[in-house]
């Protein structure tokens, strides 16, 4: 498990004005750091548990491997109905295996009309080849657009 270095109680909070981009089915861009220091960005499904922004990946995918190497990440979500409205969460990512498949299936229902990920969105055979993790992003900084902040 990759964990944050700062206690959750001191992390910046997402203001009520910008909770909806985290709870609506809007896509985010998660940026992680490659071992050579180059940024790597991925389009991701996003969730929020009241403390952390959540995304789902595998330990085998590039973003999962990058987080294992360096837990510093950035998540950007832009409201497609008002592209001047956004939230950026910078922080430390914690990869958690427990409950990750259930989290992925919740995201699948949120973002698609399918009941679960494997067998509908992705081949069921792939499930045995992957170790699913929920990426908990412990915020060190929350940035909002200036217009709606």
Language-model segments: which ranges?
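Short, conserved active-site entrance elements at the starts or edges of catalytic domains
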Residues: 2-33
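Short secondary-structure boundary/capping segments
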Residues: 19-20, 45, 65, 125-127
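Alpha-helix boundary/capping residues
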Residues: 25, 71, 107-111
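A generic secondary-structure signal marking the coil-to-beta-strand transition
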Residues: 18, 26, 51, 85, ...
């Amino acid at each position: 498990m990759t964990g944050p270095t700062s206690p959750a109680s001191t992390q910046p909070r997402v203001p009520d004005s910008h909770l909806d981009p985290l709870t609506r089915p809007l896509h985010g861009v998660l940026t992680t750091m490659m071992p050579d220091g180059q940024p790597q960005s991925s389009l991701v499904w996003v969730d929020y548990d009241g403390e952390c922004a959540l995304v789902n990946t595998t330990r085998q995918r590039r973003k999962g491997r990058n987080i294992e190497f360096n837990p510093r990440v950035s998540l950007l979500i832009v409201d497609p109905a008002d592209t001047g409205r956004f939230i950026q969460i910078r922080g430390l990512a914690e990869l958690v295996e427990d409950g990750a498949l259930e989290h992925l299936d919740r995201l699948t229902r949120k973002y698609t009309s399918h009941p679960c990920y494997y067998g509908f969105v992705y081949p069921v055979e792939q499930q045995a080849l992957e170790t699913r993790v929920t990426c908990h992003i412990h915020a060190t900084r929350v940035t909002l657009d200036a217009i709606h902040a």
